Amino acid sequence: MITLEQLRAWGADVDEAMPRCLNNEAFYSRLVGKAVEEPTFDRLREALEAGDLDKAFEYAHALKGVTGNLALTPIDRPVREITELLRSRTDMDYGPLLAEILSQRDALRELCK
């Protein structure tokens, strides 16, 4: 199970997230472990690849809630950015933002092993 020190080193704002998790380290760590396995990351990728910006917005918005509540800052920053761009249906290449999101998710997933 990932430790608070590992999460801090990765960039999570543990001090912000812990009160939301009743200051229970094991509970927070379990939630982080579940978050990195969230299928919504892949659904976001699939929706963007299909050009379905409405679905992509739904998935990005859902991820924003998860990553924000757990204060997973390195993922949350690009998730928030892509959510707002999708909300306004900005015509652009979402690939770089998606790559950053998935890269940070994968890095955190490795730490959770």
Task: Give the residues covered by each predicted segment.
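Two-component system phosphorelay core
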Residues: 1-113
